[in-house]
């Protein structure tokens, strides 16, 4: 366990397509990581799941894979969780941002991006930093009453096309800031 607290002991699950072993550990807040060993499984997902066939064809949206998952933690907790990912998961800190790099006139945050080494799995960990007002991290921690996953980012080769296709399926998005916001970005 390398110091991690167990959420789920290794459990063997089987069906006619083979077997998987699932286990899990606790991380920050109520966040858990579930591990699935599928090397002896040929089914569509996990035992008990069946492939679903639609009676209509849909156009692909362009979503490709999960790019990263961001975790928000409390004041002075980021380095503790960086060490956790290093010690428990063997991850490396391959990118860091301090409050001088991620800030506005009123708020700031700090972030360290943890990765499995080849960049396929990325977990940025954010913590609040001092500012004139509460940072988005503090607002998150207050609203959700503690640490947790802020967002999961999905990769696409064409964001305009993907958003258009997702909107046509009823997915709602936040409004984009006005052009003045983007013009001011280089000066921040």
What is each residue range found by the language model?
Residues 2-73, 77, 83, 95-132, ...:
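Vicinal oxygen chelate
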Residues 59-60, 139-143:
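Short helix-capping and inter-helix turn/linker motifs at the boundaries of alpha-helical repeat units
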Residues 64-65, 145-149:
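Short glycine-enriched loop/turn motifs at secondary-structure junctions
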Residues 82, 143-144:
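Extended non-catalytic domains of envelope/secretory-pathway proteins
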Residues 85-91, 146:
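Long hydrophobic segments that form regular secondary structure
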Residues 133-138:
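A short, acidic/glycine-rich surface segment
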Residues 148-159:
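C-terminal, well-structured subdomains that either form a transmembrane helix-short loop-helix hairpin
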């Amino acid at each position: 366990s390398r110091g991690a607290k167990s959420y789920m002991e290794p459990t063997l699950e089987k069906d006619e397509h083979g077997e998987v072993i699932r286990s899990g550990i606790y991380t920050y807040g109520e966040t858990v990581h579930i591990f699935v060993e599928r090397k002896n499984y040929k089914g569509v997902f996990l035992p008990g799941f069946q492939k679903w066939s639609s009676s209509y064809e849909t156009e692909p949206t362009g979503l490709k894979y999960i790019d990263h998952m961001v975790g928000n933690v409390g004041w002075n907790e980021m380095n503790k969780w960086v060490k956790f990912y290093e010690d428990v998961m063997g991850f490396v800190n391959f990118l860091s941002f301090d409050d001088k790099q991620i800030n506005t006139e009123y708020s700031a945050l700090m972030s360290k991006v943890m990765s499995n080494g080849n960049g396929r799995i990325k977990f940025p960990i954010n913590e609040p930093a001092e500012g004139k007002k509460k940072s988005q991290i503090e607002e998150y921690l207050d609203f959700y009453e503690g640490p947790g996953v802020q967002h999961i980012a999905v990769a696409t080769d064409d964001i305009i096309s993907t958003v258009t296709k997702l909107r046509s399926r009823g997915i709602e998005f936040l409004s984009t800031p006005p052009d003045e916001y983007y013009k001011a970005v280089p000066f921040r």
